[in-house]
């Protein structure tokens, strides 16, 4: 398959790398010049610096011959517009829309007319909600195995002795094939993290990681502070 991805953020990058590892052809459209240059070092496919809500940019990504288009930025409005434009240019393309607002997601699932433009609607909260459910119904549960993807979703307990406690996500230096999908503080409050999110001194961190990255992720997340 040939897949065009909008957004070279944490999610877009991880999806692109996973698709390429399965033998698919990938193109990424990214507005930020530095980010576009950086991501070109990690994927073998086409990287286009530009706005995916611009018809010419989508055409440069060969959208008319693509099998799927995934709008994965953190901006709902831009994702929506890009999916509509992709469908207009290629009526047979499968569109995947990322929505950060869970309330909007249900609208896209329930309104029949919207399904013309959006084949699949996903949100980071879906993954977190599924994890919460599994935790509640399965005593002692702290990981989800994803054999088809060659990956796991795993929970790490955080306390004041952990090296990562109090640090922003962007400073953890996690491997490329991993992604923090949820952070809980000691009161159980959920945060879908960005790079600036601070790891709590007490709580849990939920991470998606490919098997090749698991050991490095565990090493980072389980490291304790050196005694003074």
UniProtKB/Swiss-Prot annotation:
GO CC entries: plasma membrane
Organism: Pyrococcus horikoshii (strain ATCC 700860 / DSM 12428 / JCM 9974 / NBRC 100139 / OT-3)
Top-rank lineage group of the source organism: Archaea
Domains: entry comment: The RCK N-terminal domain binds NAD and possibly other effectors. This is expected to cause a conformation change that regulates potassium transport.
Pfam family for this entry, one: TrkA_C
MF GO annotations: potassium ion transmembrane transporter activity
Disulfide bonds: none
Lineage: Archaea, Methanobacteriati, Methanobacteriota, Thermococci, Thermococcales
Protein name as catalogued: Trk system potassium uptake protein TrkA homolog
Database matches in InterPro entries: K_uptake_TrkA, NAD(P)-bd_dom_sf, RCK_C, RCK_C_sf, RCK_N, Trk_Ktr_HKT_K-transport
Xref: PROSITE patterns: RCK_C, RCK_N
Every RCK N-terminal domain range: 1-122
UniProt keyword Transport, yes or no: yes
Keywords recorded for this protein, A-Z: Ion transport, NAD, Potassium, Potassium transport, Transport
Biological role stated in the UniProt entry: Part of a potassium transport system.
Annotated residues for binding of NAD(+): 7-11, 30, 51, 73-74, 98
RCK C-terminal domain location: 141-223
């Amino acid at each position: 398959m040939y897949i065009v991805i909008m957004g070279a953020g944490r999610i877009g990058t991880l999806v692109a790398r996973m698709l390429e590892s399965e033998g698919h052809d990938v193109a990424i459209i990214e507005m930020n010049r530095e980010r576009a240059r950086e991501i070109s070092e990690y994927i073998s496919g086409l990287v286009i610096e530009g706005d995916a809500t611009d018809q010419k940019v989508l055409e440069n990504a060969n959208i008319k011959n693509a099998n799927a288009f995934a709008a994965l930025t953190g901006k709902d409005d831009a994702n929506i517009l890009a999916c509509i434009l992709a469908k207009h240019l290629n009526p047979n393309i499968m569109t995947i829309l990322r929505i950060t607002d869970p309330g909007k997601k249900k609208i896209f699932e329930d309104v029949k007319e919207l399904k013309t433009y959006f084949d699949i609607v996903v949100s980071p909260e879906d993954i977190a909600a599924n994890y919460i459910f599994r935790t509640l119904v399965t005593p002692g549960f702290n990981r989800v195995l994803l054999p088809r993807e060659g990956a796991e979703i795993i929970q790490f307990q955080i306390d004041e002795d952990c090296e990562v406690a109090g640090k922003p996500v962007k400073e953890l230096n996690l491997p490329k094939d991993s992604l923090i999908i949820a952070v809980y503080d000691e009161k159980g409050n959920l945060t879908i993290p960005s790079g600036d999110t601070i790891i709590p001194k007490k709580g849990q961190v939920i991470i998606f990681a490919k098997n090749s990255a698991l050991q490095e992720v565990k090493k980072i997340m389980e490291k304790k502070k050196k005694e003074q």
